Amino acid sequence: NYMVLNSEYDYYNYINGTIPYVSHTAEGIFVNRTAVCDGYSSAFKLCMDILGIPCEIITGEGDGVAHAWNAVMLDGEWYMVDVTWDDPVPDNPGVVNYDYFNITDEKMRRDHSYTSDINANGTKYNYYAQQENYFTNTTDYYEYLNKKLSEALESGVENATVVIYVESLDEPIDREFIDAYTDYSKITANYHSIGSSSRYSSYVMMIVWRLS
């Protein structure tokens, strides 16, 4: 969070081909407050080294462009971390994304390509896995939404917002699922209006339900 909230990607110099050396280093993050991917990854590794947490810098490509990020070991399992891609561009003060925080090789390889001897298969410390509103199957998803709808009805509130994160499979399938639940909720929840908006990352669909 500190790195994302207190620095920004050196986009101006990147698009103009004028990236200074310091933006490739941890100094770019901690002193100049601006850097490119290898500056982010170097700064993250420095923090992990100080904390005594095993960490490596991984290089490869992100969406076909040369890129650098990190692998970190927690409780004997490796995870992939891409701080650069979790920092919004252009800079959005106060906003931190967690789509690339402690994810597996399988998820990282959806838009990153690389060769590494490290096998990142850890899931316990993935950001979303630590949240009660993250689901990998529709059964738990339904139960959670029904619970939140019931709580809202019982409390007597006129408007309610429920945010969930779902393991995304395929956008058309996900859309059908959202529409089906919307129709179901209109009948069972006694709300006059129920709608949703969604945002996709490489593997997570965030759905915001607004009820009134």
Residue ranges and their predicted role:
Residues N1-I29:
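Secondary-structure boundary elements
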Residues N92-V208:
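Low-complexity, Gly/Ser/Thr/Pro-rich intrinsically disordered linker/tail segments
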Residues I29-Y40:
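Extracytoplasmic/periplasmic, Sec-exported soluble proteins
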Residues N6, D10-N13, D82, S197-S201:
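Acidic/polar residues at beta-strand termini and the immediately following turn/coil
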Residues N1, K45, I178-D179:
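Generic solvent-exposed, charged/amphipathic alpha-helical segments
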Residues G39-E106:
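Hydrophobic/aromatic-rich core segments of domains that either
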